[in-house]
Amino acid sequence: MSKPVLSTGLRWLWLVLVVIAIDFVSKQWIMNNLMLHESMPVMPFFNFFYAHNYGAAFSFLADKGGWQRWFFAGIAVAIVVVLLVMMYRSKASDRLNNIAYALIVGGALGNLFDRAYHGFVVDFIDFTIGDWHFATFNIADCGICIGAALIVLEGFINPTSKRSEHKG
């Protein structure tokens, strides 16, 4: 009993491709225009800074000898599969959740490509204010974080409708 793909959340797969494309093009531009660890000021508080991240967010487990590359790749594959199944099971009209899932899938695949091809993730978005410095990140990370925030927002907007759907 298959259903038409366009009636499911998979209708939002175009957004996955947009995130992957912007992430890929931006990382290619950074790798072609900056040397590793080179900084390019954009604004007083915002720089492009070319970095290799061998770990996860905030360089978690970056110095653990290489096994983390495949560990985080496996986590990314699992998350992508779960979210694609969730998108298939949801209605295309469930916009907020499907947009959130698509952003996360696009971000996960963008970073997965880096891990598989380079052995590290290319990070380059760098914010500093005075002595405060935020961890360097990339467009894929933005997709993941915005998607996660949208899932939380959906929980606040429709907390009871989701619970009743799962009960009945």
UniProtKB/Swiss-Prot annotation:
The keyword Lipoprotein does not apply. Keywords: Aspartyl protease, Cell inner membrane, Cell membrane, Hydrolase, Membrane, Protease, Transmembrane, Transmembrane helix. Its EC number is 3.4.23.36. The active site is at D123, D141. GO terms for cellular component: plasma membrane. NCBIfam families: lspA. This protein specifically catalyzes the removal of signal peptides from prolipoproteins. This is Lipoprotein signal peptidase. It comes from Erwinia tasmaniensis (strain DSM 17950 / CFBP 7177 / CIP 109463 / NCPPB 4357 / Et1/99).
